[in-house]
Amino acid sequence: NSAYEYQKTDEFRCMRISHEPSIWVGDRGTWQFMVNTSKDYNTNDDYGLGTLKANFSHDNEVAKAHYYKVSFDGNGGDAANSQIELTPTSHGAVVRFTYNNTANKSVIFDCANGGSRTEYSGNTFKTYSDHTGNGSKRMYIYGEFSETPKGTKINDRKSIASFNSNRVTMKEEFGA
């Protein structure tokens, strides 16, 4: 018996990384990111993952143990005309974001259930997640983009990075 349930809705909210997933005591050290084509770093709108969603179909995804890909079509909501590809590594992931000539080419980071603060420097970023319980430690995240963002904005525990290119790769590593 497992608590896992195949997603029944057509809403895709984000990719979530968990330091230690558990159906018994809950995830600890979670951190989320999402491709976005509706917001730019200059926006004054709320851009937290709780306010964003992308329409998707399981017909537009490839899900394997070593590779995940989902494409959002022109009706894809906040991620219209974009795609995420993810390959896990031993302590991180390599992610590619593809944008189909949209005006806004952004990635949004959020730590919805804990403390976090993202710092950008050139094409790198570092952040942490304080979403912990049972005395667990903070999870640290370090990432590197294939290009320097054209602009970033940080707001409490969420941030946005916007790009010029139609394809951006992000390498990230995390640990306690």
Language-model segments: what does each one mean?
Residues 1-176:
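Accessory carbohydrate-recognition regions in carbohydrate-active enzymes
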